[in-house]
Each structure stands twice: as C-alpha cells, then as structure tokens.
Amino acid sequence: MKVQGSVDRRRLQRRIAGLLPPPARRLNISRGSEFTRDVRGLVEEHAQASSLSAAAVWRAGLLAPGEVAVAGGGSGGGSFSWSGWRPPVFGDFLIHASSFNNAEATGTPLFQFKQSDPFSGVDAVFTPLSLFILMNHGRGVAARVEAGGGLTRMANLLYDSPATLADLVPDFGRLVADRRFHNFITPVGPLVENIKSTYLNKITTVVHGPVVSKAIPRSTVKVTVPQEAFVDLDAWLSGGAGGGGGVCFVGGLGLQPCPADARLYVALTYEEAGPRFTFFQSSRGHCQIMNILRIYYSPSIMHRYAVVQPLHIEELTFGAVACLGTFSATDGWRRSAFNYRGSSLPVVEIDSFYSNVSDWEVIL
C-alpha cells in the first residue's frame, strides 16, 4: 500500500491566507502632504516595478494635458505615440445581425435610435446607407433613383430588405410628419470594430476622443462618409469644390485665414421630397455655421413653406444639425472609393478625426 505524504503546511498556509481580506490602509485626508504620501505608497504597493515610479505615472496620466502624435504624415493606418495620450471612450452596441451589413467600412458614422424601451438589451443602430434605405422606403423606385445615383445603388446592394430596417422604427412616418425623428436618433461615433455572429453583432464606436482601433497596438481609423451626401461649406461659399485647407472666401468679401481645426457636421432635414441626411465640413464658428446652413437650405425652406398650406405649428421645424467631431483643417479631406460586389461608391475620407458629438440644434 502506498503511503500518502504529509500535508504541505506552507501551501496550506498560503491558501488560507488567500481567503482572508487584505489589510486596510489608512489615508490621511486632513493634510494634503500626508494624503499625497499615503496615496503614493498605496500606488507603489500595487504597481509593477519599472524604470518610472508609479507615482510619476499616476501624476502624468491624471494631471498632464493629453497630446496626440501621429506617425505616418497624417495618412491612414498610422500609429499613435503614447506620450501623454489619453485613450478614447469606446461604446459597445449589441445589434441584430440582419440590420447591419458586415461589409460596412470602418470609420462609418453610426446613429442609434432609441424611443420607447431604454433598458432593451438589443440596440437599433443605423449607418448612412441604412438610413438612406429607411428614409426612401415606400417612396417608389423613381423617388429612390432621384435621391441619388451611386448612393442608391450601393445602399440597395448592402441592404436589400428595407422591411427589416423599417421594423426597427415602426412609427417612422409619424415621427417624420411631426418633425421629431431627430429627437430619438443620436450620433454615437465612427465604427472601429465589428464582431460578427449569426444572430447578434457586437459593434464598437469611438464616442469621444481620437478615432483609433480598439485592438492594441492602436492605429488610426479614417472616417468615411458618402461623397453624394457630403458638402464642403467653405468651398461652397467660395464657389469652388476643392478640399479643405488654405484660405476661405466669404461670399466674395475677401480672404480670411482658416483656423487650425475643421468640424464635421450632420444635418437631418425634413424636405418636401422626404427626410434627408447630409454631412457638412467647415472651419467656421458655430454661429456662422447656423447662418450659412439657413442660406444653403433657403431654396428648400421657401419651397416647403410656399407649397404646404396651411402649416401646422408642429410642422414648422425644417431640420436639425449636430457636430460629429473635429479634424485638421490643413490636412482636410480627400476623395476615395468604397467597393462592394463590383460596384463603387465615391466616398470622402478624413484622417486624424477626433470624435466629439454634440446635441441636435434646430436649423429653423
């Protein structure tokens, strides 16, 4: 018969000690110097040994201003240096796989619809292409073709079942008629990750901060919007169609230097032909943007008020605009293409984008 060895007392003691709660550590909160000393000691106990003290890392991460340095000259796919850089705020959403096409490009701005059940475990998230299908559902083939060329073709290739998207917003027609759809749809930042599944997908966006990949090592993600739904307001004011950067003309009144940063906006308008999403970029201030948008939409506004008679007080709202974030006005934006199943959609790409979503503001 084999005799079992004696019990390892050291291992038994270590296991029992692991069941006991850790000893409490007192922090002096009456004096600032002693509080700093106690916190420094607490951090050093739980931090790994390195060439830089734990207190220095803690102080640099919380007190030093964040600075972002991009390697690669502003081109997509560059890596970020970690000197004083603060990580972005990511948002995770669980959505139905049938409502989101896995071919959607990373960097696509996403919008969450939330109306009745704030505690639902499954979210309703739309892309610019799926919103295009939702807004043109039920208008007929002629109306959809009139709304856009390549955008119509690509949207119908990606989302060939408009009824699936319409089920996510069952009272879409009433919300548009009452001019209240923008109250329930919220920009949630550009797409940076999509974990595919059979029934449910988990997608991740950058709600606030630099738009980078969630996986480490971090890499920049280019924001991508359809070119047919994009307007450069600075170029529109000057009568041209060029990219960002340089100087701006103000209605022919002369030259003005552009600020270092430009902003990307999204506008939801309730036009006579139906609701429409449009992206704008400009380096001008907030008040100027609102006035410029009223001038830009003035033909549609006057047409609607002249055709629709009589107007109900709840039908006076023409649209709303929200800011999606900022980017370098010097680098500006560039044209590219999104390819899918032999079709190509002209898109606009923006590098080094900083997601900073604002609330909707009524244009008129």
UniProtKB/Swiss-Prot annotation:
Signal sequence segment: none
GO (cellular component) term, any one: viral capsid
One Gene Ontology biological process: viral capsid assembly
Cited InterPro entries: Herpes_1 (IPR004999)
Record GO terms (molecular function): DNA binding
Localization in the cell: Virion; Host nucleus
Quaternary assembly: Interacts with TRX2, MCP and capsid vertex component 2/CVC2.
Protein's job: Structural component of the T=16 icosahedral capsid. The capsid is composed of pentamers and hexamers of major capsid protein/MCP, which are linked together by heterotrimers called triplexes. These triplexes are formed by a single molecule of triplex protein 1/TRX1 and two copies of triplex protein 2/TRX2. Additionally, TRX1 is required for efficient transport of TRX2 to the nucleus, which is the site of capsid assembly.
Annotated family: Belongs to the herpesviridae TRX1 protein family.
Name of the protein described by the UniProt record: Triplex capsid protein 1
